[in-house]
Amino acid sequence: SYYKDYEVHGDIPYNGPGKAGAQTLDEANFLRSFALTYDLLESCMSTQEKEKIRDGLLLPGAEFLMEHRHMQLHNHEVIINSAIAIIGLIFGKEELVKEAVYEKYGLLYQLEHGMLSNHMWFEGAFGYHFYALTSFFAYEKFALHTPHSHIHHPNYKAMMELLFSYIEPGFRVPMLNDTNYGHTSSIYYLYEFAYREIGGDKLLYVLKELYKDEARDNLEAFIYGVDILPTCDIDRKS
């Protein structure tokens, strides 16, 4: 049980310590990626291997994240909660799902309180807006077809439609606050999953613009996209 014996270190203010990573944020990203990979591969594993990963890494990891959650509205908490909730779903740990999704500062709280009246994520930058949505959707992709999916919450559609009104010439995202082009280089691909599950012409418009200049051969389209994108009936110039 190597993970349990890792030293706790870091303790960055408003984020917290890590074990495998430098901070709680890194820990959550690591554990979420590992959990998703485990879910893909566990059918090929022996009972002993599955138990070792469950009891030696993923459940202790979720417990560590629970211990170091912050009671705050923040993109970090979206990432941390998504990791806890995914691990809870994998192993049928309802207490983890309940805490990470439904309790105060859980995923639903973040979704319902983190969106401003203009539909922007409260941190005021498209980088953070889509950084948060990336982790919301990491959870929703996994929770789809379970009672714990909230993909049809109206705030998801509102936040994804926001970009339609802000796209700059050259199909660029405005560099508001501390956003940079590195933050936004992959955000358009989130629209594949969102359009399939939520729909709407504004989401379709973003995808149609994206594929004017590149082939639709990315992994998000392959796994999460509709088979064929229909004709888009709206134009931002009108």
Predicted regions and their residues:
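Carbohydrate-active enzyme catalytic cores, enriched for enzymes
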Residues: 80, 85, 127-237
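A short structural micro-motif
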Residues: 2, 106-107, 162
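Exposed boundary/loop context
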Residues: 8-11, 112, 117-120, 175, ...
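Active-site-surrounding "flap" and adjacent substrate/cofactor-binding loops of secreted or lumenal enzymes
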Residues: 2-11, 15
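Active-site lining segments of carbohydrate-active enzymes
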Residues: 14-127, 131, 137-141, 223-235
